[in-house]
């Protein structure tokens, strides 16, 4: 524990908590603080200019990161007939209907994303108490309830991330791994921010992207100077 505490203290000493760093310097600092033995994820937190308590200002959606997430995901799909075959061809790990629902009810949740064709929601809807708390419930707002299940599978496998604002008005997302080149991380961050701007509620007033910070799994958050993102 002492070693961990010393490492955390050393990392904090590298960063001025109130300073906003150019994106290149911010990523360099984050990577230098990512000293765990595994390939830490690089995460971003975006403070939005919205009132998360208002239902018409809940920001939610998904985006396919151009450089991927660095993580392989298992995808389950509720579909039948031609759509089921298309999902399998696209790379789905598990495809089914009532049989898949029974697996879920039995606690067999060996997947990271659940996709459903609209005509299967009569089955999927009964699984809300199981899938919902785990963040697995399909939703059209993030593209996981769709007639084109094959494309949804491809998106998931290609590095799609889902985002939803929390009660504090902050979006949390992973944009890659420590092993990623900075250009890949910046490309992913840009794609995420573009998606957030597109998802801006019509009732949101004032500055929308208020603060952006990047960090690693075990590291300290580093604030990003937004003007450097367009450089």
Swiss-Prot record:
One example of a Gene Ontology biological process annotation: regulation of translation
Disulfide linkage: none
Gene Ontology MF terms in the entry: rRNA binding; structural constituent of ribosome; tRNA binding
InterPro entries: Ribosom_uL1_bac-type, Ribosomal_uL1, Ribosomal_uL1-like, Ribosomal_uL1/biogenesis, Ribosomal_uL1_3-a/b-sand, Ribosomal_uL1_CS
Pfam families xrefs: Ribosomal_L1
Keywords annotated in UniProt: Repressor, Ribonucleoprotein, Ribosomal protein, RNA-binding, rRNA-binding, Translation regulation, tRNA-binding
Record bears the keyword Repressor: yes
A GO-annotated cellular component: cytosolic large ribosomal subunit
SUPFAM superfamilies: Ribosomal protein L1
Entry-linked PANTHER family: 54S RIBOSOMAL PROTEIN L1, MITOCHONDRIAL (PTHR36427), LARGE RIBOSOMAL SUBUNIT PROTEIN UL1M (PTHR36427:SF3)
Entry function: Binds directly to 23S rRNA. The L1 stalk is quite mobile in the ribosome, and is involved in E site tRNA release.
Family designation: Belongs to the universal ribosomal protein uL1 family.
Assembly with partners or alone: Part of the 50S ribosomal subunit.
NCBIfam families for the chain: rplA_bact
Name of the featured protein: Large ribosomal subunit protein uL1
């Amino acid at each position: 524990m002492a070693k961990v505490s010393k490492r955390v203290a050393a990392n904090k000493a590298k960063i001025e908590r109130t300073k906003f760093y150019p994106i290149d310097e911010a990523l360099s600092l984050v990577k230098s603080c990512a000293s765990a033995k595994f390939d830490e994820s690089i995460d971003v937190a975006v403070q939005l200019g919205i009132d998360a308590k208002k239902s018409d200002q809940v920001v939610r959606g998904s985006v396919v990161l151009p450089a991927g997430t660095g993580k392989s995901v298992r995808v389950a799909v509720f579909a039948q007939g031609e759509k089921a075959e298309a999902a399998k061809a696209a790379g789905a790990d598990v495809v089914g209907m009532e049989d898949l629902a029974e697996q879920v009810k039995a606690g067999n949740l060996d997947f990271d994303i659940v996709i459903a064709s609209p005509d299967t929601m009569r089955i999927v809807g009964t699984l809300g108490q199981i899938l919902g708390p785990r963040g697995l419930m399909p939703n059209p707002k993030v593209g996981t309830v769709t007639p084109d299940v094959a494309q949804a599978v491809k998106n998931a496998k290609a590095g799609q991330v889902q985002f939803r604002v929390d009660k504090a008005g902050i979006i949390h997302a992973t944009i890659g791994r420590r092993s990623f080149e900075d250009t890949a991380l910046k490309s992913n961050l840009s794609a995420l921010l573009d998606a957030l701007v597109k998802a801006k509620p019509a009732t949101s007033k004032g500055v929308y992207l208020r603060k952006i910070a990047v960090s690693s799994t075990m590291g300290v958050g580093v604030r990003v100077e937004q003007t450097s993102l367009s450089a």
